[in-house]
């Protein structure tokens, strides 16, 4: 009986050991060595130091280190998932990134408690090198992350010479501080910031010199930036926009559709738009967005930045650009503040759409579609100069209702032919016809 119990116990242990452990959610202390998370088609593993790879689909990284860092790799088509739980990594003296992402897949980082990342020279605090997306989330509403870039590295995004793109923040208290010449969130020195979306959380993005709060690093532009929710405070460094271009960079295709957003340009930088010498265009404010903007003050002989629009240039202030407010709800507004003024005081100007005066018309065809080419319909916002376009699908060839017409009659020695033409034959360059033997 005793032997049977021993055998049964051993069998149970063997069975337990054979069960898949990919759902394991273990804690990994960064103080015990470098951590590498690897998501492949066969599952996700974690390796620490020189140890073996351990299956773990939801690792929780904790602890403190001034030596070790975290690498999160995701293969194409895979998503690597990691939780940062009260982790503090300061590798400024080691010349490397505190946390970096690699591979062609996606990376998802959950925040739990307060974590701080500080990276070394030319590296971003949270350095995004993966080809897919980087998502920062906070499902439990208790997470915070502070990410400091080293010189030339973004707080969150690209290292020196690298772009910061496909970044999504859905929640958490996120504070991103760019290093010299890099964005808070976006590109490093010389890098662009694009496809950046903030839909929730409390987000601060700042830089001290030549990088945008959100967007491009020095000489980099910011584009396709969307804020749809949360609280966002973006402060550009000298010569840079709060949201948009870094020093000499442009800001374009920027949409504020919700949330409470404050965007302040550094010296000669726009609140939203271009850095010094940079343009601002394609800026939309819609929904119930609560937006405050302030252009940067003069610096030497360089003019002020626009609230929304261009950065200043030598002897000239940045040009203000009228944002598209055609979809701004009565509850939404834009408040403009003068350079140097407090953004908690009275604005210089407030823009609203209280009665829906700014609306899109029904549109007009500006390029007719043909059988083979798409057309274009253009809409104009009433009361403004803004337009938008949409494609009209190609019509494709049609022989409906058409009859074959004899080209030549058959003879005793030769077949005749007859032809049917597309209903739009001769219009829009259409020459489509079908000829058959009669």
Annotate each predicted stretch with a short phrase:
Residues 354-438:
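Extracellular modular ligand-binding repeats in secreted and cell-surface proteins
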Residues 5-9, 16, 23-359:
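A composition-driven surface/loop motif
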Residues 1-3:
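N-terminal secretory signal peptides that target proteins for export/translocation
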């Amino acid at each position: 009986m005793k032997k049977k119990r021993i055998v049964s116990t051993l069998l149970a242990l063997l069975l337990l050991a054979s069960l898949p452990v990919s759902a394991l959610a273990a804690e990994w202390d960064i103080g015990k060595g470098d951590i590498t998370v690897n998501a492949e088609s066969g599952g996700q593993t974690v390796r620490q130091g020189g140890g073996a790879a351990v299956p773990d689909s939801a690792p929780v990284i904790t602890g403190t280190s001034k030596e070790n860092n975290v690498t999160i790799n995701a293969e194409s088509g895979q998503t690597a998932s990691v939780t940062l739980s009260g982790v503090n990594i300061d590798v400024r003296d080691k010349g490397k990134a505190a946390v970096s992402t690699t591979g062609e897949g996606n990376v998802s980082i959950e925040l739990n408690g307060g974590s701080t990342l500080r990276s070394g020279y030319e590296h971003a605090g949270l350095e995004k090198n993966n080809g897919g997306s980087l998502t920062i989330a906070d499902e439990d509403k208790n997470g915070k992350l502070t990410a400091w870039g080293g010189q030339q590295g973004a707080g969150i995004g690209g290292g020196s010479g690298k772009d910061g793109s496909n970044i999504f923040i859905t929640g958490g208290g996120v504070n991103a501080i760019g290093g010299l010449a890099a964005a808070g969130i976006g590109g490093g020195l010389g890098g662009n910031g694009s496809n950046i979306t903030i839909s929730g959380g409390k987000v601060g993005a700042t830089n001290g010199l030549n990088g945008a709060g959100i967007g491009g690093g020095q000489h980099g532009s910011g584009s396709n930036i969307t804020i749809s929710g949360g609280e966002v405070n973006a402060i550009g460094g000298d010569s840079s926009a709060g949201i948009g271009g870094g020093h000499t960079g442009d800001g374009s295709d920027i949409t504020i559709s919700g949330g409470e957003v404050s965007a302040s340009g550094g010296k000669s930088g726009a609140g939203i738009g271009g850095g010094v010498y940079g343009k601002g265009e394609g800026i939309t404010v819609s929904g119930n967005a609560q937006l405050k903007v302030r252009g940067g003050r003069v610096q030497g002989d360089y003019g002020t930045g626009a609230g929304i629009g261009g950065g200043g240039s030598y002897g000239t202030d940045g040009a203000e650009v009228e944002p598209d407010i055609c979809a701004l709800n009565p509850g939404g507004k834009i408040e403009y503040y003068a350079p140097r003024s407090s953004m908690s005081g009275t604005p210089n100007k407030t823009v609203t759409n209280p009665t829906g005066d700014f609306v899109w018309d029904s549109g007009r065809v500006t390029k007719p579609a043909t059988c083979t080419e798409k057309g274009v319909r253009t809409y104009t916002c009433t009361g403004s100069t803004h337009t938008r376009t949409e494609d009209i699908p190609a019509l494709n060839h049609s022989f409906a209702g058409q009859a074959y017409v004899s080209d030549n009659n058959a003879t005793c020695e030769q077949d005749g032919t007859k032809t049917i033409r597309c209903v739009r034959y001769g219009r829009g360059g259409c020459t489509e016809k079908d000829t058959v033997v009669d």
